[in-house]
Amino acid sequence: MLSMPLMAQQNHASDSKAQNKALRDSLAAATNVLAYHPDSIDLRLKKAAWNIQLEQWAYAKDDLDKVLFLNNTNIAGLFYRAFVNEKMKRYNFARLDYQNLLVLVPGNFQAQLGLALLNEKDKHYTEAYDGINNLIEQYPDSAMAYAARGGIEKERGMLELAEYDYAKAMSLDEDNQDYRINHIDLLISLGRKQDAYTELEALIKKGVAPGQLQDFYRRLRDIRRK
């Protein structure tokens, strides 16, 4: 993980507190209104969304269960509950929600991506890789799909394949720093020092402070000593 300067950390903490307070205020207001309109799907979805942002998974699931009791084909309800079930490590339930969602909206990008990543997390490795490969076939211009496959390959130690996929993701979304950072990490792991230096220079030109990249430079120096 990249280090963050102390001042930036303090500012980030302050912003997070203010944001959490605003979310809690919105949540409290929605809860009060919901007491008078218990069958409002829209209100329950809004409340669940705020619960999710506050990482209150059980509360979010309760509201999403009620949404889907009222309308078992509600697309937003299925998508959010799949996400929440995954966070609660209820993988089989999450998988079922994604599968039901794909019955309603065949080929949906987010549902297919969520299902592939869930299968990877739940060690259904063949299904995960087949799923992400199918997604890329359907959405060949999606940087997110290539990055997701790169992430899977990186976790499995398939570094050369992962490097290719992150490079492809970067070519499709040149301004995404996360893709570039993962790509640099892979280049260093593969011993491709000059390529890594080139990518680091590109990040600095895009405004990233050199101090935030010091861990990468340290790793490159360590390679030279070996």
Give residue spans per PLM region.
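N-terminal leader/linker segments that initiate helical-solenoid repeat arrays
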Residues: 6-58, 62
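Helix-start (N-cap) detector for alpha-helical repeat units in TPR-like alpha-solenoids
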Residues: 41-42, 75-76, 109-110, 143-144, ...
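Canonical tetratricopeptide repeat
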Residues: 46, 80, 114, 148, ...
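Register position in tetratricopeptide repeats
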Residues: 53, 87-88, 121-122, 155-156, ...
